[in-house]
């Protein structure tokens, strides 16, 4: 039966039911069927849940406790699926299709889509009404049967009206967008989710809120050893996850009921962004001492959070822009490094919205101001978090041609090359990403070659997606090519890493294949460092059976043919000292 016919049938049954009730005014009422209205509100995180799954849970309203995310994940922001690490906080990034989490399947019953998984649906109530109507029309039915039928009819009508006219369920916060630390606990012991404000990528490739990461660093300071080399690199902060942050912002714009303005950081007396007095107060505070300036910066940050619907604020408060850009020059007598850190954080947070990004990218003085910030940071000891934020700002705003050109003209490539010398994973990763953004459309090729960026990338003693992409795209001098040949074993190990986790994902693996192809074509003898060549060739065959771009497919086939000819299988078996089950090559 089509929906219109079913609705007409329900209306007829309701009219007949009303007439039947009028003829039986002496019958007593029975208790109505109760509905669980808890499903009308966003579901809390399951008790005992600590790590987010990689996509919205498709489970009943009371899912069992989860300890680890599933092994599948979407390829987002430089990560791909694998089992969760053993620490309790991190969670894999969500895929772009998960920004619409919480919507019901196309053919799902509306009642169940609203969260009432255990209650009657519209079809259930229609069946109850038909049964009661049949009992009314039965001339042989006893009085008790008619009384029971009247009660069933009333229950069905009440339930049907509730399903039809009740208030819509507020949007559920996708688990991937929820903060991991701190997580408040409700009176019933369940965990309450809040929108993740500042997602960062951990070295493992998992994303958490920066608040959680900072707490973990205070409790367990540690250093990292590069995945494919033996060099230890200290971590200051993790890498900002711009893509996940954009996804959260877009989701919040569509679901303003759960925007960050509803979280605990919102002041008890909200600002009135429409009042000019608030902006004038901020500008006045900037002319005071360090404490006043810090308060002004916090007020600006609140403006980015308390605007209804998480709307971008720079379009409304244009007077803030020159203050943020020129603040240190105007009030340098009372300026401190902590204030500089807060200013960079605010600018980076403002880039969350495309409208803000476009406004910032259009500022003529921003490129020069960024270069001065880096120079001052170098004079004061190179605070790594400041440098990483600067590189992150450059990477984000370089999507606009006007900013990219100004940054290159201001010496941005040389500035970012200098950051590659700092032995800090966050700074190196962000600097490589920014260089890749400046290199868009080949505009930065000449500055990159002039400042020997490829050589500096190889001296970082680490590989990430950004570094591998740059080494693949940038022109290589004979000296750089020799250094790449020296890294042949590390490149092979990257390709052999089947889980594609950590700092190198599938995108980086494809770039590693291109670099290996160049080595094989120009000097196949350098591949002699690979002891178990059969395993590597088998891995290449496995990759060739997957869906690869045509160019990569041809490169893989050429590598297999050349290596098979240069290193016949019997010779390889004679040289190999590795166990037959070994996958990583050494």
Curated annotation (Swiss-Prot):
Biased composition (Low complexity): 50-60
One of the GO biological process terms: protein ubiquitination
Pfam families in the cross-refs: U-box
Pathway: Protein modification; protein ubiquitination
Highest taxon of the lineage: Eukaryota
SUPFAM superfamilies listed in its UniProt record: ARM repeat, RING/U-box
Gene3D superfamilies hit by this protein: Leucine-rich Repeat Variant, Zinc/RING finger domain, C3HC4 (zinc finger)
KW Transferase (keyword) present: yes
GO molecular function annotations of the record: ubiquitin-protein transferase activity
Keyword Amino-acid biosynthesis: no
Alphabetical UniProt keywords: Transferase, Ubl conjugation pathway
E.C. numbers: 2.3.2.27
Reaction(s) the record says it catalyses: S-ubiquitinyl-[E2 ubiquitin-conjugating enzyme]-L-cysteine + [acceptor protein]-L-lysine = [E2 ubiquitin-conjugating enzyme]-L-cysteine + N(6)-ubiquitinyl-[acceptor protein]-L-lysine
PROSITE patterns: U_BOX
InterPro entries given in the database record: ARM-like (IPR011989), ARM-type_fold (IPR016024), Ubox_domain (IPR003613), Znf_RING/FYVE/PHD (IPR013083)
Function: Possesses E3 ubiquitin-protein ligase in vitro.
Protein name: U-box domain-containing protein 73
Organism: Oryza sativa subsp. japonica
Lineage: Eukaryota, Viridiplantae, Streptophyta, Embryophyta, Tracheophyta
Gene (UniProt): PUB73
């Amino acid at each position: 039966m089509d929906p219109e016919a079913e609705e007409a049938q329900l209306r007829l049954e309701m009219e007949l039911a009303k007439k039947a009730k009028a003829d039986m005014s002496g019958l007593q009422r029975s208790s109505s069927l109760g509905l669980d209205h808890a499903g009308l509100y966003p579901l809390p995180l399951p008790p005992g849940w600590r790590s987010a799954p990689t996509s919205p849970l498709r489970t009943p309203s009371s899912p069992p406790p989860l300890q680890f995310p599933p092994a599948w994940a979407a390829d987002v922001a430089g990560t791909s699926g694998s089992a969760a690490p053993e620490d309790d906080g991190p969670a894999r990034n969500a895929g772009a299709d998960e920004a619409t989490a919480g919507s019901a399947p196309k053919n799902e019953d509306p009642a169940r889509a609203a969260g009432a998984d255990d209650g009657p649906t519209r079809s259930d109530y229609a069946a109850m009404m038909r049964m009661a109507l049949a009992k009314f029309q039965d001339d042989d039915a006893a009085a008790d049967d008619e009384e029971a039928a009247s009660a069933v009819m009333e229950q069905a009508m009440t339930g049907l009206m509730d399903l039809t006219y009740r208030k819509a369920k507020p949007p559920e916060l996708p688990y991937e967008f929820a903060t991991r630390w701190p997580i408040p606990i409700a009176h019933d012991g369940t965990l309450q989710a809040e929108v993740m404000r500042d997602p960062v990528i951990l070295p493992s490739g998992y994303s958490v809120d920066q608040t959680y990461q900072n707490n973990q660093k205070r409790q367990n300071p540690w250093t990292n050893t590069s995945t494919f080399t033996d060099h230890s690199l200290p971590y200051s902060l993790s890498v900002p996850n711009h893509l996940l942050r954009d996804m959260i912002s877009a989701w919040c714009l569509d679901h303003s009921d759960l925007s960050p303005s509803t979280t605990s950081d919102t002041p008890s007396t909200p600002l009135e962004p429409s009042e000019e007095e608030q902006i004038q107060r901020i500008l006045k505070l900037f002319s005071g001492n360090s404490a006043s300036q810090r308060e002004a910066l916090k007020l600006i940050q609140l403006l980015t959070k308390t605007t209804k619907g998480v709307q971008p604020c720079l379009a409304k408060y244009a007077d803030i822009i020159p203050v943020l850009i020129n603040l240190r020059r105007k009030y340098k007598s009372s300026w401190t490094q902590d204030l500089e850190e807060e200013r960079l954080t605010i600018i980076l947070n403002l880039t969350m919205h495309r409208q803000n990004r476009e406004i910032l990218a259009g500022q003529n003085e921003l490129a020069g101001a960024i270069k001065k910030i880096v120079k001052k940071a170098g004079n004061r000891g190179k605070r790594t978090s400041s440098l990483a934020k600067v590189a992150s700002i450059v990477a984000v705003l370089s999507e606009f041609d006007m900013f990219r050109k100004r940054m290159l003209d201001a010496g941005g490539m040389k500035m970012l090359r200098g950051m590659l010398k700092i032995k800090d994973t966050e700074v190196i990763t962000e600097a490589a990403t920014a260089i890749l953004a400046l290199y868009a459309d080949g505009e930065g090729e000449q500055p990159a070659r002039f400042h020997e960026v490829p050589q500096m990338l190889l001296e970082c003693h680490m590989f990430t997606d950004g570094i591998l992409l740059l080494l693949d795209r940038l022109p290589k001098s004979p000296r750089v090519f020799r250094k790449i040949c020296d890294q042949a074993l590390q490149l092979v190990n990257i390709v052999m890493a089947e889980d594609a986790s950590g700092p190198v994902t599938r995108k980086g693996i494809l770039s590693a294949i291109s670099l290996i192809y160049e080595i094989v074509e120009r000097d196949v003898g350098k591949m002699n460092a690979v002891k178990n060549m059969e395993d590597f060739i088998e891995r290449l065959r496995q990759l060739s059976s997957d869906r690869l771009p045509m160019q990569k497919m041809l490169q893989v086939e050429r590598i297999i043919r050349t290596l098979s000819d240069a290193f016949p299988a019997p010779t390889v078996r004679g040289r190999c000292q590795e166990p037959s089950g070994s996958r990583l090559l050494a």
